[in-house]
Amino acid sequence: MATTPMTVVDHEAEEAVAKAREDDKSRQVDAFDAGKPPPFRIGDVRAAVPEHCWHKSPWRSLWYVVRDVAAVVALGTAAAAMDSWAVWPVYWAVQGTMFWAFFVLGHDCGHGSFSDSRTLNSVVGHLLHSFILIPYHGWRISHRTHHQNHGHVDRDESWHPITEGRYRRLPPRAKKIRFTAPYPLLLFPLYLFYRGPDKPGTHFLPSSELFSPKEKGDVMLSTTCWCIMLASLLAMSCAFGPLQVLKMYGLPYLVFVMWLDLVTYLHHHGHHERLPWYRGEEWSYLRGGLTTVDRDYGWINKIHHDIGTHVIHHLFPQIPHYHLVEATKAAKPVLGRYYREPQKSGPLPLPLLGVFLRSIRVNHFVSDHGDVVYYQTDHHLNDTTKQK
C-alpha cells in the first residue's frame, strides 16, 4: 500500500498526540503533592489487608529465632576454627548482618508482633537485644514513641529533621558528623546513651525523660541484662584476649550498627523522594506513616525479615514480619500514589548506598515555620566538604 502525504500527516499527528499525552502524564506525576491529605482513611487501608495477615504464630516466630541463632553459632564456630585473615572480613560482614537480623526479631517482640504473649515477647526480646547490647525495654519504649509520632517534626524520635534555626546554631563539627559518611552510620550507640539534638535523655536510666514512672522496673531490668552482657564480654576478653573478642564480636557488632543506622535512615529519607514532615493540625497518624519509604534489599530481604516493607509496618506494627509483603501488596491499590514503589536492588543492595550518600548531601534541615515542611539543602556545607 502506497504512503500518501495525508497518511504521513496522520501518523505524525498521532505521534504528537501520544507525546502530548505522555507529557501531560509526566506533569501530573510531577505535580503530585504527597503532603496533601490522602483521599482514604486508615480504616480503608486496614480493610484491604487480608485477615490472616494479622495472625501471630509464636511457633513460626520462634522458628526464625532458632534459624538465626543457629546461623550465628555456625558462623562463629567456623570463623574461630579457620582463624584466617582471608576469612575474617567475610565473617564480620555476614555475622554483622545476622546480628542485624537478631535486632529485627527483638524489634518485633517490642511491637508485640512476635506473639500475643507479653511474657514470651519480653523473654525473647531481652535475649536477642541484650546479646547485641541494646536495653530491650528502654529502646522498645523510645521506638514506640517513634511510631506514635512518625513524620512529626517535633515529636518523632528516630532521624527526625533538624529545624533551620537549630541547624544554624550547630557547630561545624556536629554538622560534619551528622552529614558526612561514615559518621551517620555509627551513631546508634551514642543515641542509646544521649538521644539526639534537643532531646536529652538516655535509654538506660529510669529517670530519663523517655520513660514514665510506671516503666521504671522494665527499664532497670533491661539495663541489668545489658550490664550482664557487657560483663560477659569483658570476662571473655580476659579469658581469650581482647583481640579475639574484637574479631568474634566487636567488628560484627560494628557492621550491625551500620546496618541499623543505614536502614533506619533510608526508610525516612530519600535523595529524590519529596517526603513531607508535619506539625500541628496537619499531622495525623496516617499522614505521618505515609512519609515512610519502602526499600528493596535484594536477597537480604529474607535475612533481615522483610524490614524493607516499612510503610505497612509503620501503619500497622502488629502485623508479623512474615505477612508484611502480602499485606503491602494488598494495600497498594488503596495507597495509590502515596505509596512509593522501591527501586529494585539486585542480589545486593549496593544502589541504596548511593541513595544514602546523595540524601545526606541534600536533606539537611526543615523550616522553623509551617505545618507541612520539606527538607532543604545547605549548599555551603557541601562546598565546605568538597574543599576539605
From Swiss-Prot:
Keywords: Fatty acid biosynthesis, Fatty acid metabolism, Lipid biosynthesis, Lipid metabolism, Membrane, Oxidoreductase, Transmembrane, Transmembrane helix. The chain crosses the membrane at residues 62-82, 85-105, 119-139, 177-194, 226-246, 248-268. It is found in: Membrane. Residues 1-33 are annotated as: Disordered. One of its GO terms (biological process) is unsaturated fatty acid biosynthetic process. A motif (Histidine box-2) lies at residues 143-147. GO terms for molecular function: oxidoreductase activity, acting on paired donors, with oxidation of a pair of donors resulting in the reduction of molecular oxygen to two molecules of water. The keyword Magnesium does not apply. Residues 9-30 have a biased composition (Basic and acidic residues). Pathway: Lipid metabolism; polyunsaturated fatty acid biosynthesis. Highly expressed in root hair cells. Barely detected in panicle, shoot apex, stems and leaves. It is a multi-pass membrane protein. A motif (Histidine box-3) lies at residues 310-314. A motif (Histidine box-1) lies at residues 107-111. The keyword Transmembrane helix applies. Pfam families: DUF3474, FA_desaturase. One of its GO terms (cellular component) is membrane. Its main location: membrane. Belongs to the fatty acid desaturase type 1 family. Exhibits no detectable activity in the heterologous expression system tested. The histidine box domains may contain the active site and/or be involved in metal ion binding. This is Probable fatty acid desaturase DES1.
